[in-house]
Every structure is written in C-alpha cells, then in structure tokens.
Amino acid sequence: MSSDPVAVITGAARGIGAATAARLAAAGWRLVLVDRAGDDPALPYRLATRADLDAVARACDGIAVVADVRDQPALTGAVGLAVDRFGGLDAAVAVAGGIAGGQVAWETDDAAWAAMLDVNVTVVWRLARAAVPALLQRPTPRQGRFVAVSSAGGTLGLPLLSGYSASKHAVVGFIRSLAAELGPYGVTANAVAPGSTETAMLDASAAVYGLASTEEFAGHHQLGRLVHADEVAALITWLCGPDSAAITGAVLPVDAGMTAS
C-alpha cells in the first residue's frame, strides 16, 4: 500500500459511510467522499444533507462530492478527482444504498422492484466501472481494494423486503465475480454483511414491520443488541488495509450473531 493511500467512499455523509471515512482518515488515508446529499423519492425516509457531507469532509480532511451514485459520469468524475488530486486510487468503498418495502413479493410493483436493484446493486457495479481502471493503474505489486456493503439480508430471506433482499444477494454474487476477475491483477473484492445497524435505514425497516422501536430487532441477534455503524466501519477499514491481502471474494458478517443460526 502506498504511503498515503487514497479511497473513494460512496454514501459517505452519515451512518456506515461516515464511520468508515472517520476510520480511514485516522489510518492516514486521503479521501474523496461521495453522497447524494438530498432526499430520494424512491426511499421512504430522509437522507443525509449537504451539511452532513461537508461536516464529514471537514472532520476527515477529505473532498466532498455531491453526486447521485446512479450517475455514471458523476462517479467517474469523483474517481478522476481522487486520481488528479491525490495521485491515484487504492480503494473504492461502496456504502450507498437504501431500503424500502412493505409488500409481499407478488404485490411489489415494477417501480419499487427496480428501485431496490438500482440503489443497492447497480450502484456497486457503477462504482466498479469507475474505480477499477484507476485501481489497476497503480504499479505492481498492487494492493487495490474494492469493498461493498451487502447485508444480513443478502444471506437470508426477509419477508416484506423481497426487492431489498434480492438486491443485497446480488451484491454478493457481483463481488464474488469481481474477485475472480481482479485476482490476477492483485486487487481484492469483498463484501461486508451488517445485521440490524443503528442507522436511519433501520428506522425504515422498523416501519415496514410496524415495530415501536428499532431495539426490537436486537432480539434477532445472538448478542442481544444492535450493531453500531463504527463496528461495520472497523471491518471495512481492515479490508482496505494490507493485513487483508489474502482475502478476496468473501462476504464477512458484522451482525451480532443474526445469521449464526
């Protein structure tokens, strides 16, 4: 890894993305932080704001980029900014995503289904399209990293969230294929699979199931508690570093035991 490694993070304005930015910055990484920084009509909850993104960028001494991760030219531009400003790219971290549902699979309409695939898996592919060429520009022996956030819902079936669950399963398949393609170049691709994590997305999940509190999800975890965003960020940060060099194509749970049984 270079002395001043460089990463692009999507969904960086809050939650797991912001926590990852904080950890990577503390480890000496130079960062380009991408976020929509505005609400999305496809998602039933408020998203982060420009002020949120700017606050993360200031705290991390990173560069804030307001962009919709569904916009391929915007993502390519963010990666280009990292290369131009910092001299290259060592890691791409795909955190941006969303959750919506509330209907059984056969009553889910086309728009709702397509939205989940778009915001959860197509955006990971779009980041790979933008970032992998830059990762491969590093000289050999290179140690590039591509990390995506899947979900415990990417290994389990979740009622009333078929589109979300299908999209997160698709992230797993994509990452494993990407790992097979990148292996000969010395670049790894891995996914993390968080359980119920204390973020705004969990509030939306509670609404889907009619729960009075997100704490009710803790009963599905062997540890009896929710996952903290910083705990997911800790694993992402490790996957971006040199100690994870022999791991690729893996899906690593950070779920307090949600998928243990």
For every predicted segment, state its role.
Residues 102, 156, 223-225, 237, ...:
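Short C-terminal tail/terminal secondary-structure segment
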Residues 103-105, 109-117, 217:
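Substrate-binding pocket helix/loop in short-chain dehydrogenase/reductase
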Residues 133, 180-184, 245:
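Alpha-helical segment proximal to the catalytic Tyr-Lys
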Residues 143, 183, 188, 247-249:
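Short, small/polar-rich loop/turn modules that mediate ligand/substrate recognition or access, typified
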Residues 128, 167, 175:
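Active-site helix of classical SDR
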Residues 151:
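Residue(s) in the substrate-gating loop at a strand-loop-helix junction
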Residues 2-86, 100-101, 204:
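Short-chain dehydrogenase/reductase
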